[in-house]
């Protein structure tokens, strides 16, 4: 008897999942395809997404990246707060040109990100410990009593010379 109930429950669950898969409004994540990288933290599932900012067909020189929070597993987005922009996740332009910009995050000035086109796609390229890689994600491991102390940041990307996945760890 219990096995038949489990079988019915499993079938109902699978039917429910297939219904969800056919409903794009329920599963849609509002992240544009032109994002350069994301910044995740260990404290929760919210993350900051960095998108390319194009005006016409040229890179916006004063604001080459748009940064915003993706909250609740992708259910909604919010702009960065003043504190986020000035102290942590904001983008500072070091230099810019028509199709390239050098930027860094306000929290860490030692990692310069070169925004440029590579094979027709906008990417962020970082150089760290002799490796040049196309940036995909940064992950901050938070600690301390309130979870406000950054223990390390892992930088993930694809090595430009080998094409292999690569990770570098930054310890503040």
Protein language model regions, located:
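N-terminal secretory signal peptides that target proteins for export/translocation
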Residues: 1-10
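Bacterial N-terminal signal peptides
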Residues: 11-24
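N-terminal export/targeting and maturation segments
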Residues: 26-84
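Short amphipathic beta-strand and strand-loop transition segments with alternating hydrophobic
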Residues: 36-38, 54-55, 88-93, 140-144
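Mature extracytoplasmic domains of secretory-pathway proteins
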Residues: 62-132
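Charged, amphipathic alpha-helical segments
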Residues: 128-143
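Short, exposed beta-strand-loop hairpins at the edges of beta-sheets
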Residues: 143-167
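Short, solvent-exposed mixed-charge patches
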Residues: 171-172
